[in-house]
């Protein structure tokens, strides 16, 4: 299911319960860094609901008291670390709606998440469908479908340019990166 359809379905469920009150972005390590764009977007733009981030273990062992059926938990891990799978289970147990962002449909997170977003994570990389891009897309859809966000069309249009922009940047930076690597290759670590 596409992110747009996922959020449409989630919105219908939340509307029946009084609406969305909070979005939790949960992950650890590099995945936590990758979901930050969605968190930042919602913290900056949302007017009728709030958003925070937790590490997976923190979410499991210091579960927020306000976590309930009016919350969405966006939980991310490429290979579904055990603590991140447990975070999905924790959110499910509290009645929250879970979106498991993961590297394949075979992961433990994909098995326990109510909704699953599989993001691009290999070669060749589709940056418009990376974990960062999917985190943002979830945020854009929540803002659009819940609040009628006026920048939605422009944001969605931008996805068509992401791969081209990244490819150009890689080409532009490669000579400098190679020169730096050659210069520093014998430095002690």
Where are these regions (language model features)?
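Acidic catalytic cores of enzymes that act on phosphate-bearing nucleotides/polynucleotides
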Residues: 38, 48, 180, 184-189
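Internal, active-site/partner-interface "lid" segment
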Residues: 142-182
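Short, flexible loop segments at the rims of nucleotide/cofactor-binding pockets, characterized by
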Residues: 2-5, 50-53, 75-78, 164-172
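Glycine-rich phosphate-binding loops that contact phosphosugars or nucleotide phosphates
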Residues: 18-159
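A short, well-structured juxtamembrane/interface segment
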Residues: 2-19, 168-185
